[in-house]
UniProtKB/Swiss-Prot annotation:
Gene it is expressed from: clpP
Gene Ontology cellular component list: cytoplasm; endopeptidase Clp complex
A Pfam family hit: CLP_protease
Listed SUPFAM superfamilies: ClpP/crotonase (SSF52096)
Source organism (scientific name): Pseudomonas fluorescens (strain ATCC BAA-477 / NRRL B-23932 / Pf-5)
Record's subunit section: Fourteen ClpP subunits assemble into 2 heptameric rings which stack back to back to give a disk-like structure with a central cavity, resembling the structure of eukaryotic proteasomes.
EC number: 3.4.21.92
Protein name: ATP-dependent Clp protease proteolytic subunit
Residues at the active site: S114, H139
GO biological process: protein quality control for misfolded or incompletely synthesized proteins
Places the protein is found: Cytoplasm
Length: 211
């Protein structure tokens, strides 16, 4: 039911020399095996792992929409471990997170850098978390283009537009002023989990689940 959604993640894990664990469920109908990610999706858990790119973004958006259709009133949990990636791919995930009815809780495991940090901060207010040894990094969008001077100018204007839009949204979700965001994203800005909380990118650093 869910397995095809994780073909890319499974392939990435296998390429790194690992195997995707399988879990077996027993019911009155017999046994059924799931890969671990598909089983967690049944619990409304989505993983955003690795660089943010179009194929991954399409899978994340599809899973968000599917879980909304399953239950529009129950939270979705998005776990993020990403170095960042494509702005347009990331914005498709962001827009879907804001569009659907369920709250999307975000949790950083490992790292949330660049677009990963932006999506972490875009979680539902009060439901944005980091594990204690996570790292968060914010910066301005990167871009490069070769060609005629007129084309370079067009792309430079687009990058400036994207930067302003990202900064505006980051200010909205973090509670910081636009001027602060512009200043603090001028260069790579790495933060500990606690520093990310103080800055407003997340709401809480969690060491373990509540009893």
């Amino acid at each position: 039911m869910f397995r095809n959604s994780y073909i890319q993640q499974n392939s990435d894990i296998q390429a790194a020399g690992g195997l995707v664990p399988m879990v077996v469920e027993q019911s009155a109908r017999g046994e059924r095996a799931y890969d671990i990610y598909s089983r967690l999706l049944k619990e409304r858990v989505i993983f955003l792992v690795g660089p943010v790119e179009d194929y991954m973004a399409n899978l994340i958006c599809a899973q968000l929409l599917f879980l909304e259709a399953e239950n529009p009133d129950k939270d979705i949990h998005l776990y993020i471990n990403s170095p960042g990636g494509s702005v347009t791919a990331g914005m498709s995930i962001y827009d879907t997170m804001q569009f659907i009815k369920p709250n999307v809780s975000t949790t950083c495991i490992g790292q949330a850098c660049s677009m990963g940090a932006f999506l972490l901060t875009a979680g539902a207010p009060g439901k944005r978390f980091c594990l204690p040894n996570s790292r968060v990094m914010i910066h301005q969008p990167l871009g490069g283009f070769q060609g005629q001077a007129s084309d370079i100018e067009i792309h430079a204007k687009e990058i400036l537009f994207i930067r302003e839009r990202l900064n505006t949204l980051m200010a909205k979700h973090s509670g910081r002023t636009l001027e602060e965001i512009e200043r603090d994203t001028n260069r790579d800005n790495f933060m500990s989990a606690e520093a990310a909380r103080e800055y407003g990118l997340i709401d809480e650093v969690i060491n373990q689940r509540p009893a």
